[in-house]
């Protein structure tokens, strides 16, 4: 019995050792033999076990060195695997880049490759990047699984449309930076400059408003004339081109020379049909320039029609929209009363505008009247003149009218009289200094002062007066003529010398001056508008009696 038990234990031990040899370690991939499906016994293990058998007290230093040796061998194997994998990766990508570079050379060769004579060449190409192309490139760069065919197609579609580099296109431009054409910017700045000049110089204060409006309308009309002519010419040219395109099939028919059969056929067609000759229309289109289809009279008629009807068209359109919006919220029964009220309002407005025409005329100021020519050697009464303080400025000249009566003179009448005297004397002096002695160019308000200063003093007497005909230079003016002698009775008033006969000064006697002063003092104030010899003579200080505050 004991022997049988001992035998069983021995068999179990032997079977355990045999099973230990057949056991596969899942972590030991280096000693696993895939062909036999068993584990290989490494020499290091046998050596270690032998050494353990020989010397079980092996030091830890030997075990550490053995571990480092195994680590080095594993690192070497890993490097070899990565190198092999890299070679396989490059072997697959090289053909793709080879074809890509070959395509670039083919496209550039069509334009010309650089050589010893040409030197460097600069090309431009377009790049089209699709979503599929982007995904393939990202897979390739990230080291993921990629397909050489898909990447090759993606790279082939990127570069297209090769051409030479245009250096002018890449230059800096104003439109690229600011998004506006420089011509438009210049025009806007020019308009702003004109507005600033008008505001700074106050030009509108020197030109009457209706004069400005008239000039603007005239300039607009002339500008629109050229504008409409160009528009009509463009329309005629476009219509001419369309007709030429329609006559394209007749090029061969009308261009070739007609034989006798064609002449017979054309005679038959013109005799039995009412159709126009197509070749006539064809040659008219070829020979007549569209510019002759737009005469200036047509442009003038269109411009005038547009100038008149276009504003009325917009006014009517706005009025219609206004009435439509007004009647939309009003009941149908009230439409008629509302229209009547609107008509009455328009008539009232027109009536008020007509009544206020004289007010507008007073604000704007009438046109300056032409100066009246003076009649030589004729005595004429002095017309009382008036300086108008609120007359136009700039283009408008100072307006002189009849003298204001005593009831019309305001608190500033004396100031206006003084200003009138200064301006009138300055005007007369300037005219005589420039040598302008022609009576036709003098205005009516220039002569009385000259007569008052320069005509000889005539004293009524029973004897004919003796005038000093010796020319005397006064204020740098040489007398040009001698006054005409006249024998008058004592009851008659002496005629003042006018025109060119009064340009020379005549010396009078002291008695004559005293007589004139007495006669002036004896004059009544009621004769303000009647000329008298005493009033025709300048006062003691050379002032015009018309401009005196006393009237």
From Swiss-Prot:
Lumenal side: 19-184, 238-329
Modified residues (Phosphoserine): 438, 464, 509, 524, 532
Cytoplasmic side: 206-216, 351-551
GO cellular component, one term: intracellular membrane-bounded organelle
Keywords: Chloride, Chloride channel, Endoplasmic reticulum, Ion channel, Ion transport, Membrane, Phosphoprotein, Retinitis pigmentosa, Signal, Transmembrane, Transmembrane helix, Transport
Effect annotated for changing residue 181 to R: Impairs Ca(2+) binding relieving Ca(2+)-dependent inhibition of channel activity
The keyword Membrane appears for this protein: yes
Effect of residue 267 to R: Found in a patient with sporadic ALS; decreases protein stability and expression; decreases protein stability and expression; decreases single channel activity; increases chloride retention in the ER while decreasing ATP-induced Ca(2+) release; in a knockin mouse model causes enhanced ER stress and motor neuron degeneration in compound heterozygosity with a hypomorphic allele; leads to embryonic lethality with a KO allele
Effect of residue 515 to S: Found in a patient with sporadic ALS
Phenotype when changing residue 152 to R: Does not affect Ca(2+) binding
Summary of the function given for this chain in its UniProt record: Anion-selective channel with Ca(2+)-dependent and voltage-independent gating. Permeable to small monovalent anions with selectivity for bromide > chloride > nitrate > fluoride. Operates in the endoplasmic reticulum (ER) membrane where it mediates chloride efflux to compensate for the loss of positive charges from the ER lumen upon Ca(2+) release. Contributes to the maintenance of ER Ca(2+) pools and activation of unfolded protein response to prevent accumulation of misfolded proteins in the ER lumen.
Full protein name: Chloride channel CLIC-like protein 1
Organism, scientific name: Homo sapiens
Gene: CLCC1
């Amino acid at each position: 019995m004991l022997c049988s038990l001992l035998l069983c234990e021995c068999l179990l031990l032997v079977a355990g050792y045999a099973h230990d040899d057949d056991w596969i370690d899942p972590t030991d991939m280096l000693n696993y033999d895939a062909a036999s499906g068993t584990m290989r016994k490494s020499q290091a293990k046998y050596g270690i076990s032998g050494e353990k058998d020989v010397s079980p007290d092996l030091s830890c230093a030997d075990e550490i060195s053995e571990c480092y040796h195994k680590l080095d061998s594993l690192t070497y194997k890993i490097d070899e695997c990565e190198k092999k994998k890299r070679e396989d990766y490059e072997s697959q990508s090289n053909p793709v880049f080879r074809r890509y570079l070959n395509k670039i050379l083919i496209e550039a060769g069509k334009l010309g490759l650089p050589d010893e004579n040409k030197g460097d060449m600069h090309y431009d190409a377009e790049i089209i990047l699709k979503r599929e192309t982007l995904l393939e490139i990202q897979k390739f760069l990230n080291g993921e699984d990629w397909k050489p065919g898909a990447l090759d197609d993606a790279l082939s579609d990127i570069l297209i449309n090769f051409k030479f580099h245009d250096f002018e296109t890449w230059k800096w431009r104003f439109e690229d930076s600011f998004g506006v054409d420089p011509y438009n910017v210049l025009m806007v700045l020019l308009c702003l400059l004109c507005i600033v000049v008008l505001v700074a110089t106050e030009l509108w204060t020197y030109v009457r408003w209706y004069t400005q409006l008239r000039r603007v309308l005239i300039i607009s009309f002339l500008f629109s004339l050229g504008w409409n002519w160009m528009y009509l010419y463009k329309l005629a040219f476009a219509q001419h081109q369309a007709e030429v395109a329609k006559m394209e099939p007749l090029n061969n028919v009308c261009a070739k020379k007609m034989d006798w059969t064609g002449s017979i056929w054309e005679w038959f067609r013109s005799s039995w049909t009412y159709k126009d000759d197509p070749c006539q229309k064809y040659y008219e289109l070829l020979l007549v320039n569209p510019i002759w289809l737009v005469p200036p009279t047509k442009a003038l008629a269109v411009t005038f029609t547009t100038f008149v009807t276009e504003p009325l068209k917009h006014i009517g359109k706005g009025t219609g929209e206004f009435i439509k919006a007004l009647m939309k919220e009003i009941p149908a029964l009230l439409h008629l009363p509302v229209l009547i009220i609107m008509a009455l309002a328009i008539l009232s407005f027109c009536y008020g505008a007509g009544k206020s025409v004289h007010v507008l005329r007073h604000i704007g100021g009438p046109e300056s009247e032409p100066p009246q020519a003076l009649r030589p050697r004729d005595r004429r009464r002095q017309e009382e003149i008036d300086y108008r303080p609120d007359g136009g400025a700039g283009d408008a000249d100072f307006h002189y009218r009849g003298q204001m009566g005593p009831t019309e003179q305001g608190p500033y009448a004396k100031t206006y009289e003084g200003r009138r005297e200064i301006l009138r004397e300055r005007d007369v002096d300037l005219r005589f200094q420039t040598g302008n002695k022609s009576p036709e160019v003098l205005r009516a308000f220039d002569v009385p002062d000259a007569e008052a200063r320069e005509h000889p003093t005539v004293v009524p007497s029973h004897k004919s007066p003796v005038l000093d005909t010796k020319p005397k230079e006064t204020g740098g003016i040489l007398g040009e003529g001698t006054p005409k002698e006249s024998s008058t009775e004592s009851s008659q008033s002496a005629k003042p010398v006018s025109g060119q006969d009064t340009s020379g000064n005549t010396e009078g006697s002291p008695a004559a001056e005293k007589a004139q002063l007495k006669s002036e003092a004896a004059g009544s104030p009621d004769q303000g508008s009647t000329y008298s010899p005493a009033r025709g003579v300048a006062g003691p200080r050379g002032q015009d009696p018309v401009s005196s505050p006393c009237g």
